[in-house]
């Protein structure tokens, strides 16, 4: 199973695809999943493991992504991480574009600078690739959507 831990509670990676892999996810202590892949919804696989899934599908098509996509993910992540003992796994099919993009939005919403968050993700997960249009999408979301509390 392709899981890269960025912090003690946030991981990024590739697709789950099977019950056996979902069992590995559960054994890793993951309680919440943001599934960015359009190809497959993890929700049915997670039911038996009491893992909450946000299926937030988007195509890896190198086009600008709307703020609503990031808002859904960030709100889910914030709600999940407010609870003690939770762990969040953000993934797409390969863990190269879409999952790192959403992870960037989540980390920045938690107060990380864009550059520091990108360095963390790329440092721990060298296959992560930040397409310019995806970084611009995250920046636009952060400029327009984050509230004045400076989250």
Predicted regions span which residues?
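Cysteine-based protein phosphatase catalytic domain of the PTP/DSP
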Residues: 1-87, 108-140, 146
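A phosphate-binding catalytic loop at a beta-strand-loop-alpha-helix junction
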Residues: 85-104
């Amino acid at each position: 199973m392709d899981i890269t831990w960025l912090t003690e509670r946030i991981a990024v990676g590739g697709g789950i695809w099977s019950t056996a892999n979902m069992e590995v996810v559960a054994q890793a202590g993951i309680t919440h999943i943001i599934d960015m892949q359009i190809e497959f919804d993890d929700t049915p696989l997670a039911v038996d493991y009491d893992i909450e899934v946000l299926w937030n599908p988007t195509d890896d098509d190198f086009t600008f992504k709307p703020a609503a996509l990031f808002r859904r993910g960030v709100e889910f992540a914030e709600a999940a991480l407010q609870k003690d003992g939770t762990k969040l796994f953000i993934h797409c099919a390969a863990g190269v574009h879409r999952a790192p993009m959403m992870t960037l939005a989540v980390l920045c919403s938690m107060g990380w600078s864009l550059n520091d968050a990108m360095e963390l993700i790329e440092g721990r997960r060298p296959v992560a690739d930040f397409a310019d249009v995806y970084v611009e999408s995250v920046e636009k979301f952060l400029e327009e959507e984050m509230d004045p509390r400076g989250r």
